[in-house]
Amino acid sequence: MTSVTRKGIRIMAEIISGKVVSAAKREELKERVKALNEKGISTGLAVIIVGNNSASRVYVNNKKKGCEEIGVTSFEYALPEETSEAELLSLINELNNDNRVDGILCQLPLPKHIDEKVILNSIDPAKDVDAFHPVNVGHIMIGDFTFLPCTPAGIME
């Protein structure tokens, strides 16, 4: 424990290693996925990226690597910048109905000609990895933290 003083208030804080916590969480998830697989239940994450945003590409590659590390099947959909909103909605509809896909992540930002709100609202709330769908935001707002997206869940843990 470390003592920190801010504005005359003394706070006790514990310095943690993000790498250590993350490695432990990956091992825990790996075991959970393995247990599901042993029961004949497979897990899948669909990641959609539209365009060539380099920061988004890094994020998507990290998700793919993370899935591989813990045994989750990763489905990547790299679409060209000129993909229409209708085409993207069609893909999301297919993924919403695909039993191999448990989670859908549509990487933001989307090209300017695509309405992010329309796209995010089209993802099945039960498969909405980022919890951007109004149903999931509503659960979080009333204190129902049954499902939290990765970043807030990591911060709270």
What are the roles of these predicted feature ranges?
Residues 1-11:
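Short, Lys/Arg-enriched N-terminal segments with co-localized hydrophobic residues
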Residues 12-41:
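Positively charged, low-complexity intrinsically disordered leader regions
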Residues 42-51:
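Short beta-strand segments enriched in small/hydrophobic residues
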Residues 45, 67-82:
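Short beta-strand elements in bilobed, periplasmic/extracellular small-molecule ligand-binding domains
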Residues 50-65, 146-157:
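Glycine-rich phosphate/diphosphate-binding loop of Rossmann-like nucleotide-binding domains
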Residues 69-72, 94-97, 123-126:
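Non-catalytic terminal and connector segments of soluble metabolic enzymes
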Residues 87-99:
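Short, well-structured alpha-helical segments in soluble
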Residues 106-157:
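Anion-binding alpha/beta catalytic cores of soluble intermediary-metabolism enzymes, centered on
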